Amino acid sequence: MMRRSLFQRNDLHYKNKEVMITYNAEGIAMPKIKKRLTSKWIKAVAASHGRKVGEVGYLFVNDDKILEVNREYLGHDYYTDIITFDYDEDDVINGDLVISLDTVRTNAEQFGKSYDDELHRVIIHGILHLCGINDKGPGEREIMEANEDRALELLATLRSE
């Protein structure tokens, strides 16, 4: 049984028979990402973890909106770069990912990364969560970061093709 998305989706998506990845923005300008390339990358990363992509929705927001979502749905009173809502079914990943572009920009500056690199790191971070990789327990953060690094290397390869 398919679930209904937490967020209303527009027509910005990459779709084929098995995959639907949507990209929307609320209260902030849509980031300049190559949607087809990003969707191909997401599908490849999921496949490398033995998963298929079903319905994945990205919602890009500002800090005020992510704080609202964090409070309303998770009971947390703090800003974050991404919140992942997991609706996985067996080996198919399904979920909504809410990304604060304000926090992405702040983190890029803090960590000395480009905005584009940090945005793609956060985009794939949510997919890795949907693939079952956690980052809260002992040693898990290092595993997550290693997976992010491998995924970003794959993105660089796909961009050069």
What positions do the PLM features span?
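An acidic/histidine-cluster motif and surrounding catalytic segment
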Residues: 1-120, 131-161
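Conserved ATP-binding N-box helix of the HATPase_c
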Residues: 128
